Curated annotation (Swiss-Prot):
Protein name: Cytochrome f
GO molecular function term, any single one: iron ion binding
GO biological process, one term: photosynthesis
Organism from which the protein derives: Eucalyptus globulus subsp. globulus (Tasmanian blue gum)
Family stated for the protein in its record: Belongs to the cytochrome f family.
Lineage: Eukaryota, Viridiplantae, Streptophyta, Embryophyta, Tracheophyta
Assembly mode: The 4 large subunits of the cytochrome b6-f complex are cytochrome b6, subunit IV (17 kDa polypeptide, petD), cytochrome f and the Rieske protein, while the 4 small subunits are PetG, PetL, PetM and PetN. The complex functions as a dimer.
Cofactor(s) listed in the protein's UniProt record: heme
Cofactor binding: number and manner: Binds 1 heme group covalently.
Keyword Ribonucleoprotein applies: no
SUPFAM superfamilies named among the record's database cross-references: Cytochrome f subunit of the cytochrome b6f complex, transmembrane anchor (SSF103431), Cytochrome f, large domain (SSF49441), Rudiment single hybrid motif (SSF51246)
Gene this chain is encoded by: petA
Length: 320
C-alpha cells in the first residue's frame, strides 16, 4: 500500500514538473517573439504621431537619411514593389549591449494607405521573391494590415529592403477610391539611445549629474566605470555609473561642470523618415486615355492623307 502511494506521489510530481517547465517555455517564447520586431509596437498604438513624426525617433536620436521608391501609379489588385533604402557606412561598428563592437542592424516601418497590404506569397513573382530574400514582414497590429514592420536584421545584407505590396480594388472595397495616396516610411540603422521606459542604453553619451571634482574612478570587472564626483562646498559625493561601451573622457582630479560629458558618444547609427505618393489608377480611365490617343493619331493620319489628296487634285488641275 505504501509503495503504491509512493509511485502515485512520484507520478504527480513528474506531471507537475513537466507542466511548470512547459508554462515557463511558453511564456519565454511569447515574450521574446512579442519584443523582437520593433520596440515601438510595445508602446504606441500608431507609429505616426499627429505631427507626422514617426515614434522610432524617440529612441533613435541621431538623424540619418532614408529613401523610398514606389511606382508612380498602380492598377487595382496588383502586386508592386516598395523599395526602402537605409544607407550607412558598412565599415563602421556599433557598440553592442555587452560593450563590445559589432555590425549594425537595420529596421523599417512602412505606413501604407488604408486598403494596401502585404502581398500574399502566392501572388509574389519569383523575381520579387529573390529580391526579398529571407526577410519576414509583419503587421504593426493585427488590425493594421497597412502598416508593416521589419527588423532588426543584418545591415550588411539588408540595407535595401523590398516590400511586396498588394493594391486594393475599389470594386470590392468601398472605402477605397481612385486617388493619389501618401506613403510614409521610417528606417533606422544601429541601436537606439533610449529604451521605451526612458532609460539610457550604452549607445549614447553620459553626462555628469553634479558639478565638482572627480575624486575616484573605478573600472568594473565586466566593463564600465563608477565615477565619484565630490563637491567641496557641501562635502557631498555623487556616484555616476557608466555602462560598458562609451569611452571615458575625464580623469581623477579633474574639475567638471554639471551636465559635462563624461564619455564620448559611441553612436554611429540613426533614424530617418521620408514619404512618397502613389496613384491608384482606374483601368477604365487608362483605356479611355489610350482610346483618345489612338483617335488623335488616326485623325493626324487622315489629315495627312487628305492633304496629299488635295495636293494631287490641285496638281492635276494645274496640268490640265
Amino acid at each position: 500500500m505504501q509503495t503504491k502511494n509512493t509511485f502515485s506521489w512520484i507520478k504527480k510530481e513528474i506531471i507537475r514538473s513537466i507542466s511548470v517547465s512547459l508554462m515557463i517555455y511558453i511564456i519565454a517564447r511569447t515574450s521574446i517573439s512579442n519584443a523582437y520586431p520593433i520596440f515601438a509596437q510595445q508602446g504606441y498604438e500608431n507609429p505616426r504621431e499627429a505631427t507626422g513624426r514617426i515614434v522610432c525617433a524617440n529612441c533613435h536620436l541621431a538623424n540619418k537619411p532614408v529613401d523610398i521608391e514606389v511606382p508612380q501609379a498602380v492598377l487595382p489588385d496588383t502586386v508592386f514593389e516598395a523599395v526602402v533604402r537605409i544607407p550607412y557606412d558598412m565599415q563602421v561598428k556599433q557598440v553592442l549591449a555587452n560593450g563590445k563592437r559589432g555590425g549594425l542592424n537595420v529596421g523599417a516601418v512602412l505606413i501604407l494607405p488604408e486598403g494596401f497590404e502585404l502581398a500574399p506569397p502566392d501572388r509574389i513573382s519569383p523575381e520579387m521573391k529573390e529580391k526579398i530574400g529571407n526577410l519576414s514582414f509583419q503587421s504593426y497590429r493585427p488590425n493594421k494590415k497597412n502598416i508593416l514592420v521589419i527588423g532588426p536584421v543584418s545591415g550588411q545584407k539588408y540595407s535595401e529592403v523590398t516590400f511586396p505590396i498588394l493594391s486594393p480594388d475599389p470594386a470590392t472595397n468601398k472605402d477605397v477610391h481612385f486617388l493619389k495616396y501618401p506613403i510614409y516610411v521610417g528606417g533606422n540603422r544601429g541601436r537606439g539611445q533610449i529604451y521605451p521606459d526612458g532609460s539610457k542604453s550604452n549607445n549614447t553619451v553620459y553626462n555628469a549629474t553634479a558639478a565638482g571634482v572627480v575624486s575616484k574612478i573605478i573600472r568594473k570587472e565586466k566593463g564600465g566605470y563608477e565615477i565619484t564626483i565630490s563637491d567641496a562646498s557641501d562635502e557631498r559625493q555623487v556616484v555616476d555609473i557608466i555602462p560598458p561601451g562609451p569611452e571615458l573622457l575625464v580623469s581623477e582630479g579633474e574639475s567638471i561642470k554639471l551636465d559635462q560629458p563624461l564619455t564620448s558618444n559611441p553612436n554611429v547609427g540613426g533614424f530617418g523618415q521620408g514619404d512618397a505618393e502613389i496613384v491608384l489608377q482606374d483601368p477604365f480611365r487608362v483605356q479611355g486615355l489610350l482610346f483618345f490617343l489612338a483617335s488623335v493619331i488616326l485623325a493626324q493620319i487622315f489629315l495627312v492623307l487628305k492633304k496629299k489628296q488635295f495636293e494631287k487634285v490641285q496638281l492635276s488641275e494645274m496640268n490640265f
